[in-house]
């Protein structure tokens, strides 16, 4: 029936009233797709190629790569879920590789892809949580911080435990080392400092938290006796290594980001020693001063890929 008095149209007024009460809580931002600096021409012939990286500043520099991909072997381990979304990398040694499997087992391979040792330091119930591990190598020690709030140190030659501890919240960042301390950030946007020798906590520095779990891995660098890190809501914070007190902090997003952190993505922090560079999926590419946290400039670039610094570029 086309008669609006018919029972077919009975719920029409209720629907219209319901529609009036719908509030849009997030907006879609227009993504700019264009070539950056189209007229710019670069002469890279005088760039010095170096295989050295500055790990505590995430600065890869210019690398010598011929553009060839050649398979030289394969390493077998149980398949990780969401492999396209995670940002975890193996540890490359002079004579082998270290990685982990879906149950949290740490596996060390030699150059011939042969397993040297395989160790799992989780209970049966913890294995079901499929912990994801972040690594840091320091001499004969391998430090691990995982996605189920455990952190520990193992002997890199045997895989045996040196010490093992638990945090209140899971970890979600790189691990950085400075002298006798290691630094890592958990899901509550808290930077934690631990002693290398036994894993005891030196201090922690908490920043604002978000209402949702972040979908990005937080980044850290160390410069001028400060640990500088990103968090889930886009804040960049510098903390004094010895005291754990905040030196400076730069919020890069509005307060509404607290409700939208799952969709917010930011690149790793990269420093040349004077400035810090990073970008995000909000059309923002930043350069900030490493000493003060003040903004040098912002360009419209939509990317969460790690910047690469080559010379003064």
Task: List where the protein language model places each region.
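Extracytoplasmic beta-rich repeat domains
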Residues: 13, 49, 69-91, 116-139, ...
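Blade/loop signatures of beta-propeller domains
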Residues: 15-32, 39-74
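Beta-propeller domains
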Residues: 60-70, 102-116
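Short loop/turn segments that connect beta-strands within beta-propeller blades
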Residues: 110-114, 155-159, 195-199, 241-244, ...
